[in-house]
Design a protein with these regions (language model features):
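C-terminal helical subdomain
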Residues: 90, 94-95, 101-153, 162-164
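Active-site loop of short-chain dehydrogenase/reductase
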Residues: 39-51, 87-90, 133
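Conserved N-terminal glycine/acidic-rich loop preference
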Residues: 28, 70-76, 104, 112, ...
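A short, exposed helix-loop element centered on a Lys and neighboring polar residues
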Residues: 32-33, 77
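Conserved mid-core segment of classical short-chain dehydrogenase/reductases
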Residues: 1-18, 61
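Catalytic loop of short-chain dehydrogenase/reductase
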Residues: 46-71, 76-77, 81-85, 96
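A short helix-coil junction within the Rossmann-fold of NAD(P)-dependent oxidoreductases
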Residues: 8, 34-43, 82-83
Length: 167
């Protein structure tokens, strides 16, 4: 089967770009809103949004994808800001499975079966400490800290290690 092709921003028509945004951002918003109805009522739940670093390092000919996935990551952070104080048992996390070995992915990418195991394990982990965490493949991406915080942790011999997903 031929691999899907990408089109340069200059040759992509607006309706096609907007469909990509509707799928990636609109789908994330719609699914989260639908799931939250029951979660807010129960006071607990788990949201795991599938994300990417495409907003930080866009690939050529993928502007709509990069913008929409970046907006979805911002939406995840906005959800956390809206809900975490009132509903600490609703756990919200971003997960980036990596480039997959699929028709749309890359030949030497992550086997989809492995990514599925990581995704299921992370989705089933309802530890409230995971709210706001971002995982890439099977490892947490720790937030960047300023020089002052890094020095303080160094002097106090505290080293935070990224969490791992263990399927």
């Amino acid at each position: 089967m031929p691999r899907p092709t990408r089109a340069a921003t200059s040759s992509t028509r607006a309706p096609k770009a907007l469909r990509t945004v509707a799928t990636n951002l609109g789908g994330t918003v719609a699914c989260c809103r639908a799931a939250l109805e029951g979660m807010v009522e129960d006071g607990q739940g788990r949201i795991l949004n599938v994300a990417t670093f495409a907003d930080l390092a866009p690939l050529p000919a993928s502007s709509a994808y990069s913008v929409s996935k970046g907006a979805a990551r911002i939406f995840t952070r906005a959800l956390i800001a809206d809900l975490s104080d009132r509903f600490p048992e609703i756990v919200i996390t971003d997960w980036m499975p990596g480039m997959l070995r699929t028709q749309m992915g890359i030949p030497d990418g992550v086997p989809p079966e492995q990514a599925a195991r990581w995704g299921v394990a992370l989705a089933l982990d309802a530890d409230p400490a995971l709210t706001g965490a971002t995982f890439e493949m099977d490892r947490e991406i720790l937030p960047q800290r300023g020089l002052k915080a890094r020095l303080k942790n160094l002097l106090m011999m505290r080293r935070r290690r990224p969490r791992r997903i263990l399927p």
